[in-house]
Regions:
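Conserved N-terminal segment of class I S-adenosyl-L-methionine
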Residues: 1-159, 169-172, 239-243, 248-256, ...
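Alpha-helical structural signal in soluble globular domains
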Residues: 110, 114, 174, 178, ...
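A short His-aromatic
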Residues: 160, 164
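Short N-terminal helix/helix-N-cap motif within the alpha/beta-hydrolase-1
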Residues: 166-170, 197
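A short glycine-rich, Lys/Arg-flanked "PGG" loop and its adjoining helix->strand segment in the class I
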Residues: 169-184
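Short, glycine-/aromatic-enriched active-site segment of Class I SAM-dependent methyltransferases
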Residues: 188-217, 222-227, 243
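Substrate-binding/catalytic lobe of Class I Rossmann-like enzymes that use SAM or dcSAM, i.e.
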Residues: 221-249
């Protein structure tokens, strides 16, 4: 039984049996811990703290984007959708896709606009209702509770979901069940092995539960590969991108500008070496 002080996560979410060890990185919730086998980093947040920060997502006004921010988001979505179609070797109209943890359904909307047969699943009731109010086919609840048929989707997406999960393996196992043989699972999350994380340490915004509610589990390319294998997926590729060293709001203008120039110069090396702070894992359900 968890006490208020007991960490919500007590074992490696990837499935390793190695004892977790404290690191030197101290967050508001306590020291980050590391799995000695896969390098996964884990928050020391209690269940109460986790639930407190997760509450921000169940708000009908959450995650509204407009203007240039929405334009950039749509461009990213179109690029990802084009790659999904390319990996599947199908036209969008022949692809059934589900965005799991879809929030307001922005990616669902982008997929529908591109001709995909797209829908979403979102556990937060208010935000799921906001998506439906916008005319999007979004179900409320967990993927595991939807009772989808076996092998019914060509592609699934999990954008900024796995870092919230104490035990992600059941979700990935369900993803494998509902995907068709050869289907694609696309996962996005932060990269705890990035140059950004190494440089910023405890200042990395991805570690900040007050800013990014419920972030308790921090992946790296190796731990993502192990999780994928444990769930029965084949890794097509793992991409990382972007470097940053400072937060704009907490850094003097001159220092921020210099750091941004250096970060931009390192974007390509970070991408090539797997050290960018955004991670995108392209997984495939085996054809047999």
């Amino acid at each position: 039984m968890n006490t208020p002080e007991t960490p919500y996560v007590t074992t490696c979410p990837v499935g390793c049996t190695t004892t977790l060890a404290d690191t030197a990185l101290r967050l508001r919730e306590g020291l980050l811990r590391r799995c000695g086998s896969c390098g996964q980093l884990l928050s020391s947040a209690s269940a109460a703290r986790y639930n407190e920060t997760m509450a921000q997502f169940d708000d009908s006004a959450f995650n509204i984007t407009t203007g240039s921010a929405q334009t950039r988001r749509d461009a990213v979505a179109r690029k990802r959708l084009a790659r999904i179609a390319g990996l599947l070797g199908k036209l969008p109209r022949d692809i059934r896709l589900c965005d799991v943890g879809c929030s307001r359904g922005q990616f669902v909307a982008a997929a529908v606009a591109e001709g995909f047969g797209a829908e979403g699943v979102e556990p937060a009731p208010q935000i799921a209702q906001a998506a439906r109010d916008a005319g999007l086919p979004v179900r409320t609840g967990l993927l595991e509770d939807q009772q989808y048929a076996d092998s019914c989707f060509d592609a699934l997406t999990l954008f900024e979901v796995v870092e919230h999960l104490r035990t992600p393996l059941p979700l990935l196992t369900e993803c494998r069940r509902v995907l068709k043989p050869g289907g694609i699972l696309l996962i996005s999350t932060g990269n705890a092995a990035s140059w950004t994380a190494a440089t910023m340490g405890a200042r990395w915004d991805y570690f900040d539960m007050a800013r990014d509610g419920g972030h308790i589990s921090f992946f790296n390319p190796r731990s993502m590969e192990i999780l994928a294998a444990n769930a029965g997926f084949v890794v097509e590729r793992i991409d990382t991108s972007r470097v940053k060293f400072h937060d704009r709001e907490n850094t003097p203008r001159g220092r921020y500008a210099a750091g941004k120039l250096l970060a931009e110069a390192l974007n390509l090396p970070a991408r090539l070496l797997g050290r960018g702070h955004d991670m995108l894992a392209w997984l495939r359900k085996p054809a047999q």
